Amino acid sequence: MIALLTGKLAYKSPEFIILDVNGVGYQVHIPFSTYYTLPVEGGALSLQIHTSVKEDAINLYGFRTQQEKELFQLLIGVSGVGPKLATGILSNSEPSELADSLVNGNLARLSAIPGIGKKTAERLVLELKEKMKKLGLAQPQAGGTTAPAKQEIRDDVLSALINLGYKEAVVQKALAELKVTEDATVELVLKQALKILMK
């Protein structure tokens, strides 16, 4: 099984990258949390890898941190959650926010993630609550967690997109088209902004 790849970033997109390792190009699926930390194409890159083996395909999923990889592996261990949905969950929620939602049973926030209904959210909490506590990512709170301020989210997304090479004026225009909700996360708004910028 491939657990780590180090090489040069040959191509990147919000859904997958191609990593050149000694002349061999590996297609690696990634969450947005990994995408917006990538170097420019041609830059050096090392990714933690989860290898998914099926009868008809072998897919690689890459993460910048071991923590994200462990979260991904916990998610796909839940009945009804496959690699694609797990990647989507990580794309729409930061690790600490996801852990908080699971530990505190925040079904509303979990259900707001695309692809997750109430039943799946309940199953995630039931199966992962104690495991999240052991990872030490969450900060249990009696009243649940407080969503990041809307302006703080916009500022973080603006900074991330500028680092990706987009001009500030173009990003500001894209952000003006978005409606940031109370339960929004940086990853979710980033994903929405990228859709607008890539039209």
Curated annotation (Swiss-Prot):
Residues 65-143 are annotated as: Domain II. It comes from Citrifermentans bemidjiense (strain ATCC BAA-1014 / DSM 16622 / JCM 12645 / Bem) (Geobacter bemidjiensis). Residues 144-148 are annotated as: Flexible linker. InterPro entries: DNA_helicase_Holl-junc_RuvA_I, Hlx-hairpin-Hlx_DNA-bd_motif, NA-bd_OB-fold, RuvA, RuvA_2-like, RuvA_C, RuvA_C_sf. One of its GO terms (biological process) is DNA repair. Homotetramer. Forms an RuvA(8)-RuvB(12)-Holliday junction (HJ) complex. HJ DNA is sandwiched between 2 RuvA tetramers; dsDNA enters through RuvA and exits via RuvB. An RuvB hexamer assembles on each DNA strand where it exits the tetramer. Each RuvB hexamer is contacted by two RuvA subunits (via domain III) on 2 adjacent RuvB subunits; this complex drives branch migration. In the full resolvosome a probable DNA-RuvA(4)-RuvB(12)-RuvC(2) complex forms which resolves the HJ. It is found in: Cytoplasm. Residues 1-64 are annotated as: Domain I. Its main location: cytoplasm. One of its GO terms (molecular function) is four-way junction helicase activity. One of its GO terms (cellular component) is Holliday junction resolvase complex. Belongs to the RuvA family. Has three domains with a flexible linker between the domains II and III and assumes an 'L' shape. Domain III is highly mobile and contacts RuvB. Keywords: Cytoplasm, DNA damage, DNA recombination, DNA repair, DNA-binding. This is Holliday junction branch migration complex subunit RuvA.
